[in-house]
């Protein structure tokens, strides 16, 4: 759940599943949210839960338009913390996507929210050259070479990251 997609959708980092309905949270505050007390998936007694939370910029989304093969979408960026949440509509063509960081990202996670696809990960120290490497968060597979289909062979810059034509 996040302020880009809203409290009604969830993603699991260990699964390739698409967005799914979440009914566990309500009443989002500036710095917190309420958990629905009667829900067994998020508030069962004697069960340990983890919830990851990052505050991007309070819910203000900056939009960008599609231009040729470069997807349109938007982002929320917290430049002080060094992360952004980016959403875009893919073109299945090689292009670039704005990230709003003002610095070169060292790690990028991409997930198709509308279909069952893997989490595709870039990390600047994955190998040489890192931009030609790929791994999937939701599998145990090793880092692989990918021939530019994921990151287009284009290193991230202070304003954009590259996308290839992979359908993952």
For every predicted segment, state its role.
Residues 1-168:
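Surface-exposed molecular-recognition determinants
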């Amino acid at each position: 759940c996040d302020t880009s997609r809203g409290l009604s959708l969830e993603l699991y980092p260990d699964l390739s599943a698409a967005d799914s309905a979440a009914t566990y949270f309500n009443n989002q505050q500036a710095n917190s949210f309420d958990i629905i007390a009667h829900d067994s998936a998020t508030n069962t007694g004697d069960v340990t839960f983890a919830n990851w939370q990052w505050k991007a910029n309070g819910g203000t989304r900056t939009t960008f338009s599609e231009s040729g093969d470069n997807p349109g979408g938007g982002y929320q960026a917290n430049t002080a913390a060094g992360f952004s949440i980016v959403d875009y509509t893919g073109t299945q063509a090689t292009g670039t996507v704005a990230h709003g960081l003002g610095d070169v990202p060292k790690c990028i996670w991409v997930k198709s929210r509308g279909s069952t696809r893997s989490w595709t990960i870039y990390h600047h120290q994955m190998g040489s050259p890192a931009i030609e490497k790929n791994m999937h968060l939701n599998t145990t597979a090793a880092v692989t070479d990918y021939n530019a289909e994921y990151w287009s062979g284009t290193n991230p810059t202070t304003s954009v990251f590259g996308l290839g034509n992979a359908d993952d």
